[in-house]
């Protein structure tokens, strides 16, 4: 791999005096990207191979080159407004990524400056309130960014597509049909014709790095940047930042969720209708996401395993949907 990376880095550096591939990151991820921590000429970088067939999930299609260019443009925009987004490096031709063919796959190679920091995944009221302030700052700045490349698609459209995928396999399973009916109810409750689309990036805890002073030091995600309804995006963040036992846990805390809204100063932008939507948006974000759909399709032929799986996500949905009604 070192030789392959060195061949690509010739497009970025006039001279390469030293190169070390220090670590392969996020192995065996669903998106088939390759990600390495490297050191070139004594400086650390993130070397990312983004698969040309990459998709966030089947509901939203593949990530095109045009979208990737626009995503990088948005990161520059945020950096211009003093948001600590990871710095992307253009190649010597001035392009934001380099096209690479390897092992019968096509990739977009993106080189970024490495950021040292800590992921905080066990959320506390103080940390979450601090990040709520940061998220509000980012969203307010993002309101002025306009794009003709990104599509304005509601998360609800994605959930409907997931429902269609499940319904095609659910005819013989009573428990799954009941679950689908519950999901449809939440989609209906979360619907509004008054969407406020702003460009957002995925600010989940694994994409945010903190410094020793408990301040946000860096944001590293960029390939999920797109238009998102502001309230739908806010519900997505509350799902993540209400977790007190780590990102693999379904344990959430209403006090922590409320602390996020306090930091975000949500009271001065949310309408009564937005608060009504939150309960169902939270349910959908945790209990009808791509991980749920993928697992459901994988166990659908095993009745017992399917029932146990649905119960886990049914309980999760109940916890999420009651987060803000318990405060």
Model-identified regions with their sequence ranges:
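All-alpha amphipathic helical-bundle segments outside canonical DNA-binding/catalytic cores
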Residues: 270-282
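Active-site acidic catalytic loop and adjacent metal/ATP-binding pocket
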Residues: 31-42, 46-48, 185-232
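Active-site activation/catalytic loop segments of kinase-like enzymes and analogous catalytic loops
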Residues: 231-269, 284-300
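Conserved NTP-binding catalytic cores of kinases and kinase-like/nucleotidyltransferase enzymes
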Residues: 1-89, 211-212, 327
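Conserved structural core of kinase catalytic domains
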Residues: 93-127
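An alpha-helical support segment within catalytic cores of ATP-dependent transferases
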Residues: 9-13, 147-148, 159-201, 211-214
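ATP/Mg2+ or Mg2+-diphosphate-binding catalytic cores
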Residues: 289-327
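Conserved kinase catalytic-core helix
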Residues: 115-150
């Amino acid at each position: 791999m070192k030789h392959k990376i060195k061949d690509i880095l010739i497009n970025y550096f006039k001279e390469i005096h030293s190169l070390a591939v220090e670590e392969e990151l996020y192995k065996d991820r669903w998106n088939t990207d390759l990600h390495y921590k490297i050191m070139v000429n004594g400086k650390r970088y993130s070397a990312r191979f983004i698969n040309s067939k990459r998709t966030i999930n089947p509901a939203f299609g593949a990530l095109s080159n045009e979208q990737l260019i626009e995503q990088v443009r948005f990161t520059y925009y945020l950096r211009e407004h003093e948001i600590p987004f990871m710095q992307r490096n253009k190649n010597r031709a001035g392009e934001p990524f380099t096209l690479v063919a390897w092992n019968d796959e096509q990739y977009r190679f993106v080189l970024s400056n490495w950021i040292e920091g800590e992921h905080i995944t066990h959320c506390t009221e103080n940390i979450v309130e601090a990040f709520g302030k940061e998220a509000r700052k980012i969203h307010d700045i993002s309101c002025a960014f306009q794009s003709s490349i990104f599509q304005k698609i509601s998360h609800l459209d994605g959930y409907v597509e997931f429902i269609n995928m499940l319904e095609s396999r659910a005819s013989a399973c009573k428990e799954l049909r009941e679950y689908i009916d519950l999901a449809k109810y939440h989609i209906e409750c979360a619907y509004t014709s008054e969407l406020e689309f702003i460009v957002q990036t995925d600010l989940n805890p694994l994409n945010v790095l903190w410094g020793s002073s408990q301040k946000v030091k860096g944001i590293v995600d960029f390939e999920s940047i797109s238009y998102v309804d502001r309230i739908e995006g806010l519900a997505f963040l509350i799902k993540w930042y209400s977790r007190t036992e780590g990102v693999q846990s379904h344990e959430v805390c209403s006090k922590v969720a409320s602390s996020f809204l306090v930091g975000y100063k949500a009271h001065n932008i949310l309408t009564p209708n937005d608060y009504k939507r939150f309960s169902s948006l939270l349910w959908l974000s945790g209990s009808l996401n791509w991980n749920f759909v993928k697992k459901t399709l994988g166990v659908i032929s095993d009745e017992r395993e399917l029932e146990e799986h649905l119960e886990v996500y049914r309980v999760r949905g109940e916890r999420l949907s009651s987060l803000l009604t318990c405060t």
